[in-house]
Amino acid sequence: MTEIIDGDAVAAQLRADLTGAVETLETAGVTPRLATVLMNDKQASETYVSMKQQDCEEVGIAAEDVRIDPEASADTLFDTVAELNAREDVHGILVQDPTPDHVPDERVLSAVDPAKDVDGFHPENVGKLVGGTPRFKPCTPHGVQKLLAHQGVDPDGAEVVVVGRSNIVGKPLANLLAQKAAGGNATVTICHSHTDDLAAHTRRADVVVAACGVPELIDGDMLSGDPVVIDVGINRVDADTEKGYELVGDVDYDSAEAAASAITPVPGGVGPMTRAMLLYNTLAAASEQTGVAVALP
């Protein structure tokens, strides 16, 4: 019988385990603080920021919400980030996507102090990750690693197919899983929109990670040998519901569940883990900046 990987439950346990690190910091006179900068008026971003704040409050991390008018200049955003960089009481900084079109994405990635870049996307931190000495593992890839570990899946020697090559999930996850380290040593194939015969790759995989942003692309016919299926996607599609839509992943859940040994649902799979790993990185950042050693799960 296929096992449903409950990301909500795993994330809840991780948050509980993180409270020890918070207590260690507090005992040393350090209140870990995460500042989130929001420069858009999208409801999805508002909801996500609110959920992050609730997570912070649950474990004892101070959450600071900084809002900037989407019509403001790009310099307004960068000046705000510079002020947060300079504050010793702020340990983690997150600029919530998306930012307005007039704000250069590459400049946003480079604006946050690498030591406070808890998303792990600053070029310096990307380089450290690729070099095998990550300061912060990007939240979603790290969350996927934690889910696999919770499931008892050791990537060492496994065939892993990552469908998607984004800088946020696909590429960093492939790098993490291939590294010569715990949670790595997998043989990783990255597939994407130009891959010929995608199913030929997914059918030979022990683990399939779907992170391509295409609703229900991966179905049961594309799986073989009872793989573990991790669905990173979350897509809003039209549906005959009260809201007029429903959320689906990049995996056709019903058919894939029948062909998999274990699978993550959408929602309630990877999403909660992404938020939990943001807390993890914030505590790691606070520890690094203050010199207070903490034990992280």
Swiss-Prot record:
Keywords: Amino-acid biosynthesis, Histidine biosynthesis, Hydrolase, Methionine biosynthesis, Multifunctional enzyme, NADP, One-carbon metabolism, Oxidoreductase, Purine biosynthesis. It catalyses: (6R)-5,10-methylene-5,6,7,8-tetrahydrofolate + NADP(+) = (6R)-5,10-methenyltetrahydrofolate + NADPH; (6R)-5,10-methenyltetrahydrofolate + H2O = (6R)-10-formyltetrahydrofolate + H(+). Pathway: One-carbon metabolism; tetrahydrofolate interconversion. NADP(+) binds at residues 164-166, 193, 234. Catalyzes the oxidation of 5,10-methylenetetrahydrofolate to 5,10-methenyltetrahydrofolate and then the hydrolysis of 5,10-methenyltetrahydrofolate to 10-formyltetrahydrofolate. Belongs to the tetrahydrofolate dehydrogenase/cyclohydrolase family. Homodimer. InterPro entries: Aminoacid_DH-like_N_sf, NAD(P)-bd_dom_sf, THF_DH/CycHdrlase, THF_DH/CycHdrlase_cat_dom, THF_DH/CycHdrlase_NAD-bd_dom. GO terms for biological process: L-histidine biosynthetic process; methionine biosynthetic process; purine nucleotide biosynthetic process; tetrahydrofolate interconversion. The gene is folD. The keyword Hydrolase applies. PANTHER family: C-1-TETRAHYDROFOLATE SYNTHASE, CYTOPLASMIC (PTHR48099:SF5), C-1-TETRAHYDROFOLATE SYNTHASE, CYTOPLASMIC-RELATED (PTHR48099). This is Bifunctional protein FolD. GO terms for cellular component: cytosol. Its EC number is 1.5.1.5, 3.5.4.9. One of its GO terms (molecular function) is methylenetetrahydrofolate dehydrogenase (NADP+) activity. Pfam families: THF_DHG_CYH, THF_DHG_CYH_C.
